[in-house]
Amino acid sequence: MAVAKVQYFGTGRRKTSVARVRLVPGNGKIVVNNKAMDDYFGLETLKAIIKQPLQTVEMEDKFDVLVNVRGGGHSGQAEAIRHGIARALVKADGELRPVLKKEGYLTRDPRMKERKKYGLRKARRAPQFSKR
């Protein structure tokens, strides 16, 4: 029989991105969709966004982070991963909740793309008006 491995799950969302995050005790490796985080995300700012919850609670080298993320663009995916990591950390240690909540990492950002309306070019952009 296999030894039960301790792991913590968290689901993060942002815009149309959904990230399923798994925290496993380890040395701080972050894997996104079976690729190293450095290969998946090119921009340093996005990598920094992902690491924020772990840095806030000083657990960067305590967990390996395994992520499966779908939908949206790179920025939305990075913020969804941040949300998922924060939720998983709370499952790992409930005492971290106030710290992460204060930083805003546990709050789901409700802003979504506004739908396009008929008669307009975009959600709010009207066609050009001509007096004559």
UniProtKB/Swiss-Prot annotation:
Q: Name one Pfam family in it.
A: Ribosomal_S9
Q: Name one GO cellular component term.
A: cytosolic small ribosomal subunit
Q: Which UniProt keywords apply?
A: Ribonucleoprotein, Ribosomal protein
Sorted alphabetically, which Gene3D superfamilies does this protein's record hold?
3.30.230.10
Compositional bias of kind Basic residues: 113-132
The organism's place on the tree of life at top rank: Bacteria
Per its record, what are the GO molecular function terms? Answer: RNA binding; structural constituent of ribosome
Enumerate the SUPFAM superfamilies for this protein: Ribosomal protein S5 domain 2-like
GO term, biological process aspect, one:
translation
Q: Where is this region: Disordered?
A: 104-132
NCBIfam families hit by this protein: PRK00132.1
The record's similarity note reads: Belongs to the universal ribosomal protein uS9 family.
The protein in question is named Small ribosomal subunit protein uS9
Organism, per UniProt?
Natranaerobius thermophilus (strain ATCC BAA-1301 / DSM 18059 / JW/NM-WN-LF)
Lineage from the top down? Bacteria, Bacillati, Bacillota, Clostridia, Natranaerobiales
